[in-house]
Amino acid sequence: MAISKNLPLLKNHFRKHWQERVKVHFNQAGKKASRRDARVAKAAKIAPRPLDLLRPVVRAPTVKYNRKVRAGRGFTFGEVKAAGLTPAYARTIGIAVDHRRQNKNQEMFELNVQRLKEYQSKIIVFPRNGKVPETEQVLSTAAAFPIAQPAVETETRAVQDNGESAYRTLRMARSEKRYKGIREKRAREKAEAEAEKKK
């Protein structure tokens, strides 16, 4: 059984000098500083390229969150092709490509194609082995190409009480589904009994 949560350990027959194998996180502050230094070093090394990749606009899954858009993992092959690129070349110029994601609607497809075209219009591609001219480095692609939440257009309407109860409607629908078979059987038996009486 794996150890989880801050609970007493069951059947704790420890051996093998377990005190030496306890994982602690006293280096949390040091790791934070190390990650920051690594980011700065990477930015200097790959300059003037940005640190991150261009990500697509995707709608968050599930009913709870699907009204919001966020950055996805990568553009689909279809989006990349519609923007006039190949997946292999797109990856070399700072565009994330995801071979698993599928396009489910035209709206997001067109939005991401437009995002790719905007990126292409602003990007400066230097030769691999040529001399890189002095240009200002854009550290974050995400900051340069932000994902804005779409404005929701809503209109106020008068509240109408038609006397129906949502709870009652749901209970009736559940009841109809649950007892559909037995009710049909009873009606069928009743019709057969009446037919027998007429004979």
From Swiss-Prot:
* Cited PROSITE patterns: RIBOSOMAL_L13E
- Which GO cellular component terms are attached? cytosolic large ribosomal subunit
A molecular-function term among this protein's GO annotations: structural constituent of ribosome
**Sorted UniProt keywords:** Ribonucleoprotein, Ribosomal protein
Map out region (Disordered) in residue numbers.
178-199
Q: Does the keyword Ribosomal protein apply?
A: yes
Which BP terms in the Gene Ontology apply to this protein? translation
Record's family?
Belongs to the eukaryotic ribosomal protein eL13 family.
Name under which the protein is recorded: Large ribosomal subunit protein eL13
Species of origin: Maudiozyma exigua (Yeast)
What is the gene called? Answer: RPL13
